[in-house]
Amino acid sequence: MDKIKLGFVPTRRSIFSAPDAIKYRGLTADRLREIGVDIVDIDDINDEGLLFDDSHIEPIVKKFRAEGVDGIMLCHANFGTEYVCARLARELGLPVLLWGPRDERPEPDGTRLRDSQCGLFATGKVLRRFQVPFTYMTNCRLTDLEFERGVWDFLAVCNVVKTFKHTRILQMATRPFDFWSTMCNEGELLEKFNIQLSPIPMTELVQAVRDAQADEQAMAAMLAHIRDSFEICIPEDKVPAVAGLAIAMKRLVDKYGCNAGAIQCWNALQDELGIMPCAANAILNEIGIPVVCETDIHGAITALMVEAADLGRHRGMFADWTVRHPDNENGELLQHCGPWPCSCAAVKPKLTYPLAFDHPGALTAEAKHGDLTLARFDGDNGEYSLLLGNARGIDGPAGMGTYLWVEVDNLKRLEAKIVEGPYIHHCVAIHANVVPVLYEACKYIGIQPDLYDPIEEDVKAYLRGE
């Protein structure tokens, strides 16, 4: 599972009980550690370990940056000091979780010790004034279910933001000429989102494969992995090319400091190596390096976002929307030539031939059924959005490649969304419900969430703890 560091910032206000604020600072920190959260506290910033003065901001910023914090939690241990919270949050520029523990029953004389909820109202307004996006977790008790769920969902949001803002994609050759749908604006991706491409020519990839094939130790290990993972249904003399390509892509990803890849797939690669890249893609996808087909840069970005939203617990499946189910009016075939990881398959994949080409190197396997999230990051004319929603695996006719028949609530509505854009026939599926996390992450990365079902109020209700 991916690791995220949370900067824990309890805050107080002078007119309410400092001892109670200190008490709830400790209780909250203990609860966060109990549920497995890696926190960086501010206990060494002042005697109370609380934020309430401007002088605390600089040392907190310095500490959190040195520790590599990925997001912060503004914990209103009592009312809190809203303007100092906002100044800190703006200076850090990280995702912000705003929360306070539910207040106790007033004292017999009517005295209230903390007024944490009231402080949340104030801080929410001031964060808006400072133009700081934030995530609100409902005012609840430390032992409430929504506390643990809300914290972990926020950590997943932080992971999406962190991944998205530190993405570099290995672009292996140009897009296929016939695939105008996968064109992207490299300069705009960098200017808007800090998403970088590392383009290399096909000749460099082919040479890297040749170099890999000369490495006997690496080849022996990869060939053993292939034989263990796949049922071999191609000529034996083609298997080393698959192994060499997988090794080469991993080395090039490392060389250029990338976290994903996009490959041209056809036709130049077949002229040089005599194989399709699908199985090699699947091998890298399995180890958490998404490699997508047809040089679909936006598809690679989608894959990174979807897996980050699940904290790396499951692998994504880069797919085509292909044909409607012959018997189910809301059924659709998700399929591609074979890049899906083995962990997604319901059976041992066959290393074989693809649907539309004569060269070996594809995989065939139906994916596991179950509940899914489907997503697609895309854009045109300077505007970007994230199509997302839910689906479930269903039975259907046998297929070629890696495939899964899915059912959505209203296929006609989804179909229109894809056609009218800015999306294309590619998406990424994952065996997890990460719709709320992706929806929330959009506010931090400057793209518009685009739900293909009318579930926005349900998503918001989930996020606020209902």
Language model: regions and residue ranges:
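Cap/lid and interdomain-hinge subdomains that line or gate substrate/regulatory clefts
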Residues: D2-L6, I39-V40, G100, E104-A221, ...
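N-terminal beta-loop-helix "entrance" segment that forms/cooperates
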Residues: V37-A66, Q207-E216
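Short, well-structured alpha-helical segments in soluble
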Residues: S55-V69, L88, I247-K255
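Long, internal scaffold/assembly segments composed of regular secondary structure
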Residues: A221-M222, D228-A309
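Extended hydrophobic packing segments that form well-structured cores
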Residues: D358-E466
